[in-house]
Curated annotation (Swiss-Prot):
Disulfide bonds: none annotated. One of its GO terms (cellular component) is ribonucleoprotein complex. It comes from the Eukaryota. It holds the Pfam family Ribosomal_L20. The keyword Manganese does not apply. GO terms for molecular function: rRNA binding; structural constituent of ribosome. It comes from Psilotum nudum. The lineage of its organism: Eukaryota, Viridiplantae, Streptophyta, Embryophyta, Tracheophyta. It is found in: Plastid, Chloroplast. This is Large ribosomal subunit protein bL20c.
Length: 114
């Protein structure tokens, strides 16, 4: 079998992996094999946590809406149900921002749905 000299291809591949892991500590950014493993692990975590980030923000918005709603003697569940029944289409992100930044507007929304 003839020898294959990969030339710059192998070096370019290794340098891309090492560039991806620059900033990692110790051998995880210096040695190719460990850097490759950590790079794959980091990409796996990034993929997983993109979904988790959406989940966490939704939980945060629901908590904020619930706290503001309970200050006005209505539960989160009843509030969301009333919004749908009155065909008021505000998503949880916007409701949470209104609840945090503009209490009067939030109270007005609650007055409309009661």
């Amino acid at each position: 079998m003839t020898r294959v000299k990969r030339g710059y291809v192998a070096r370019r591949h290794r340098n891309r992996i090492l560039a991806l892991t620059s900033g990692f500590q110790g051998a995880h950014s210096k040695l190719f094999r460990t850097a490759n493993q950590q790079g794959m692990k980091a990409l796996t975590y990034a993929y997983r946590d993109r979904a988790n980030c959406k989940r966490d923000f939704r939980r945060l918005w629901i908590t904020r809406i619930n706290a503001a709603a309970r200050e006005n003697q209505i539960t989160y569940n009843n509030m969301i149900h009333s919004l749908y029944m009155n065909q008021i289409h505000l998503n949880r992100k916007i409701l949470a921002q209104i609840a945090a930044l503009d209490k009067d507007c939030f109270v007005e929304i609650l007055r409309i749905i009661k």
